[in-house]
């Protein structure tokens, strides 16, 4: 029996392809289970966790080489059997999440039955964005003005 925990973390301010690497790992682990490399794959599902907020996009390559830039949905959506989890400590903008879910549905990905949101994730509201824009945090910290700062 094999069990894996793969963690993709970065220490750089800005893009370093964490999303692409995470997507590749989900694809690899999912296919390992399908090929029988993991004899207990049903008891060890592939889980793709997103921790963060809509201020950062992660590009992943889906079916047919289509590129997706995701800001809320975990990149593991590319594998139909992956469980998608937005973790505690994440910031969620429901407008962005809804837009991504709809876009993925139109592209042929059914994620609603496998997308979970931790009840301790922070819900961003338009007020958060306004407060950030009205402060000096955008200039001082290089904020993306998405309500996270």
Question: Model-found features: residue ranges?
Answer:
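Non-transmembrane, aqueous-exposed alpha-helical and coiled segments at domain scale
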Residues: 1-148
């Amino acid at each position: 029996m094999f069990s894996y925990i793969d963690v993709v973390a970065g220490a750089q301010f800005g893009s370093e392809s964490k999303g692409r690497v995470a997507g590749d790992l989900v694809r690899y682990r999912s296919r390992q289970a399908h090929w029988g490399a993991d004899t207990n794959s049903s008891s060890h599902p592939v889980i793709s966790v997103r921790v963060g907020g809509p201020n950062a996009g992660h590009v992943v390559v889906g079916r047919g080489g289509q590129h997706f830039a995701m800001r809320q949905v975990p990149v593991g959506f590319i594998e139909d059997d992956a469980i998608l989890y937005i973790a505690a400590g994440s910031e969620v903008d429901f407008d962005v999440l809804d837009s991504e879910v709809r876009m993925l549905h139109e592209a042929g990905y059914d994620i609603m039955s496998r997308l979970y949101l931790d009840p301790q994730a922070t819900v961003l509201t338009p007020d958060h964005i306004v407060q950030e824009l009205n402060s000096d945090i955008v200039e001082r910290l290089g904020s993306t003005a998405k309500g996270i700062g």
